[in-house]
Amino acid sequence: MHFTVCDFLLDLVQNSVEAGAKAVAVEVIEDGSWLAAEVTDDGKGMGPDELERAKDPFYTDGVKHARRKVGLGIPFLLQALEQAGGDYELRSERGKGTVFRFRFPAEGVDTPPLGDLPGFWLSACCFDGDYELLMKRRDASRGVAYELRRSELLEAVGELNDAGALVLAEAFLRSQEELGDEDEENERRA
């Protein structure tokens, strides 16, 4: 089930990795008016017909998931955007990759919460495959802004296949979100 924006983002990153992307970029922006995100990849891309079918919950190519009869990730996201009054842009070109940009009204009653962003970053780094993940974050209201790369995280903590490395990676990712909160607290004290 998709309860948060991070759930939708994880589906999109998984799609990118499974489409053979070597480079995936995810940007999450909160500016007070909108909760926006963009996922860009250099995977196999889709032609116009495939792009339309990707929006259909009753379509799956049968290749990625041989036993699955439906593909719900993108259709669920589109439904959530429609309900909340959000908008999106989905572009793809065969052999070049895909760009999925979307935004929800920040104060919309039907806007899903962002969710656990550091947990999402960690999960997105753990997919099998040789890919670079660029993680970009801006939250104007909290003064948080950072950019991270999967390769840098792996270089710092090692492969993400043991508990120690996962704990270190998660602590580091959470610290990036807390930096803005610390700055805000210091300003209040001054």
Language model features by range: what are they?
Residues 22-29:
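A conserved short beta-strand within the histidine kinase catalytic ATPase domain
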